[in-house]
Amino acid sequence: MKYDTSELCDIYHEEVNVVEPLFSNFGGRTSFGGKITTVKCFEDNGLLFDLLEENGLGRVLLVDGGGSVRRALINAEIARLATQNEWEGIVVYGAVRQVDDLAELDIGIQAMAAIPVGAGSEGIGESDIRVNFGGVTFFSGDHLYADNTGIILAEDPLDIE
């Protein structure tokens, strides 16, 4: 499904929070949305593999990487796993790598930057916790919508026709 965050903000201006414009699109889908699962991990993506093994239909993985752009939390292998398990998208408060490969995959990916250095994989982090970045507080179960214009968040799913 295609989402237009500008239109959604016009219709639901009192029901949505707008994330500060820190992110760029890196995935093959330019718009995506769904129910979020939160994860907090700093320069370590081991926990992401476990989460992305789950069925992702209708879901978006929201990764609080502490805003670090020193190591990429998302790479082509992780993004392919997410695509295979039907995740709608990934939002990373951090960096990605292998951007040409990411652009070929049918998944939405938004991140702050790209860098060739990979993250550790020790599995250090927490999931399903409250995270805060971009002027917004995110809870697992909230609903996120993203496109080239921006990212918005709603507590409940928006009625989109």
From Swiss-Prot:
Keywords: Cytoplasm. Signal peptide: none annotated. Its main location: cytoplasm. It is found in: Cytoplasm. Disulfide bonds: none annotated. GO terms for cellular component: cytosol. InterPro entries: RraA, RraA/RraA-like, RraA/RraA-like_sf, RraA_gpbac. Gene3D superfamilies: Ribonuclease E inhibitor RraA/RraA-like. GO terms for biological process: negative regulation of RNA catabolic process. GO terms for molecular function: endoribonuclease inhibitor activity; enzyme binding. PANTHER family: 4-HYDROXY-4-METHYL-2-OXOGLUTARATE ALDOLASE 3-RELATED (PTHR33254), REGULATOR OF RIBONUCLEASE ACTIVITY A (PTHR33254:SF29). Belongs to the RraA family. HAMAP family: RraA. Homotrimer. Binds to both RNA-binding sites in the C-terminal region of Rne and to RhlB. Globally modulates RNA abundance by binding to RNase E (Rne) and regulating its endonucleolytic activity. Can modulate Rne action in a substrate-dependent manner by altering the composition of the degradosome. Modulates RNA-binding and helicase activities of the degradosome. This is Regulator of ribonuclease activity A. It comes from Pectobacterium carotovorum subsp. carotovorum (strain PC1).
